[in-house]
Amino acid sequence: MDTTGLRERAEAWRKADPDPETQAELANVLAKSDWADLADRFAQDLEFGTAGLRGVLGAGPNRMNRAVVRRTTAGLARYLKATVPDVTTRGVVVGRDARRLSKELAEDTAAVFIAEGIPAHVFPEPVPTPVTAFAVLHLNAAAAVMVTASHNPPEYNGYKVYWGNGAQIVPPQDVGIADAIAKVEPANEVPLLTPAQGRAKGLWRDLPEDVGHAYLRAILDLRLYRKGSDTLSLVYTAMHGVGGAWAALALKEAGFPRVTPVAEQQQPDGRFPTVRFPNPEEPGAMDLSIATAERVKADVVLANDPDADRLAVMARDASGKLRLLTGNEVGVLLGHYVLTQGTKRARPHVVTTIVSSTQLGEIARGLDAAYDEVLTGFKWIANRALERTAKEGTQFVFGYEEALGYTVGTATRDKDGVGAALVVADMASWCQARGTTVLGYLEEIQRRFGLHVGAQRNVTLPGAAGAQTIRAIMQAFRASPPANIGGTPVTAVRDYEKGEGGLPPSNVVAFVLEGGGRVTLRPSGTEPKIKYYFEHKETPAPGEPLPQARQRAEAKLAALIDAFLVLARDRGQPA
């Protein structure tokens, strides 16, 4: 290791760092001559992609910090001025969550934009990510930045970019912005204006509460049943994030007086003190919600993640036990509900991803709706909806991805956990009026369209050796795809690296199985993992109790997973 060169780079970066806190942090690392830590901090520049930036807070170019955000914003601002002629008129929205350093990073973002002559429409308080996405369209802004790391652990933060169409950026915008960032001067040389200077010039514009009110009106308009319920008991958790006040107001306005918040998690707290990971999918994250629900005998539990763009749902089964629904089950419920109970449209359009359940497609075909599968990430859902509306006149009504992301209608062009919570409550009250439950409604759908069960397995492979192993796994399955998995014939192989189905090339391989099942594998885009997605379809026998059919389906799914992992091991790859 060239420690002399590493020290020189670190000293130069520290001198250009505008933040005394990270200056001191890096000085301490240098004083200890912790070369491994320094090598990691300076291994690369934190990569800017379609998801923007996300990383651990700390000093150095491979961390999230004020220096990185100032340079990133300068590059984004200059790219906008080069590609969006009216950006200095329309401006850019700046929002933030309640994580550590989010306020400072958002203020730096706005300060750089206004120094570049671009008006900054700034949320003065933390807001849900979907509110920032909504504001782009509501204000006709040229773009938006949301400072958030969503459901990552507390040591993370991030920087999410939306374009003027209200959707997250897609290629080639990410490459163009990254190229512009690479040309930016050191952070301490990036021009800034203070909020007072910006307000005096009319460039720093604090957003009024009217924008939030408009968002609430828009999501309240998503309801289909619209009658609320005095008797439906709901529990809601904000998971220490920013959704609490927004969800409470929306549910109250929608006619749901019996909403019990999880008190320990209702207020924003970037430390996330009651959970190991602030992600409703993680084991233990829902424990306080379950305890609250049992105490008040709740019918349904609604859980947002910290930036309120995702939603987890729990509901009671026939025995009265609370069950956590999968993202696919919630997606199927909402998709069917919107297509059957919503305003009848000439060409309704629903969209999901290539790693989500295929059941939404079966429902769409059965109900004569347009349907698409796109790559993972809500940016692809939003952009496909826009494309088909422009080319074919379809009307987008619903989109989802299995990782607890949903959007109903076109109020926002990103996943919206608050809006989805409101529509789930609306659906639950409709079910109650029909004499059934959320899970009873799911059984109705499964009897008509089949019982789909799914699971995901992640294999963590850290470091350079792990990255090489992941590449080898993908290459091996491409070079020699299995003829069957656990005795079930593979009827088709879909290699998305070749632009399968007209999609942009992506490092994903799927094996379609006889009977409607599927196994899909892809490397994670943000973590050192390879992800395996499994789906099995079972057709219940006439009159067969659904729990019995589900038990059989789960057993077959488990056998499919075991067979695939054995296949991976037999080929010499870890699983």
Regions inferred by a protein language model and the residue ranges of each:
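Conserved phosphate/anionic-ligand binding catalytic regions in large, soluble enzymes, centered on
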Residues: 42-62, 149-152, 238-246, 250, ...
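Short acidic, glycine/serine/threonine-rich loops at helix termini
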Residues: 103-108, 133-137, 155-161, 182, ...
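Long hydrophobic segments that form regular secondary structure
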Residues: 219, 229-251, 255-257, 286, ...
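Gly/Ser/Thr-enriched, mixed-charge loops and adjacent short helices
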Residues: 13, 17, 21, 37-46, ...
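Phosphate-binding and adjacent anionic-ligand microenvironments
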Residues: 294, 298-300, 321-323, 341-522, ...
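An N-terminal, well-structured beta->alpha segment
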Residues: 8-109, 204-232, 242
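N-terminal small/polar loop signature for handling phosphorylated ligands or for N-terminal nucleophile
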Residues: 93-156, 250-313
